[in-house]
């Protein structure tokens, strides 16, 4: 089966700074992948390339069989900062198909409610792929857990392909089929860790020794990396 998203030797430079170095990654149709790594490892850069907001300096990305040359309706994007139009009501923010929300402005909503609205708006457009850049990062711990469960419930019904960036290792393991660990300076793929835990995910799974073992493996991978220099990378070291 062909992957839904393919990063093929993707390189991204900002002037003399190498942000992404030869990223190769396939994400299967219907897969839920989380991406973790230290600050500056290129997680958001990779997602912006996947959405078409950035064009890579080298290599390319395919969605299905089509090269990504810009944003497209088959890709929905959800950001940490909610990305709602403050001058529109909640109803208007999700007007692509959801009509049973209250006629309130986003400023009247809590953080969790704003993010529910943003996710609902993305889902209402019926994208094949959801690109999520730390969508729960600004939420309190309890709301964050509830949002994780709601997202997994929606994903389990429709199995859209999800690429989800997070700094939270527990969140990465709880949500994903696979955890993509990136390394920094330059940003590159470090390793891929499978999450062999059943769905639906529950509180019992969070507390299980199997979950702890995977979490510890991801934690060790993220926090025990040595950044390379551009010169080392260019020599393949």
Swiss-Prot record:
ATP binds at residues 37-44. Its main location: membrane. One of its GO terms (molecular function) is ATP binding. This is Putative ATP-binding protein BMEII0108. It comes from Brucella melitensis biotype 1 (strain ATCC 23456 / CCUG 17765 / NCTC 10094 / 16M). The keyword Translocase applies. Gene3D superfamilies: P-loop containing nucleotide triphosphate hydrolases. Residues 5-205 form the ABC transporter domain.
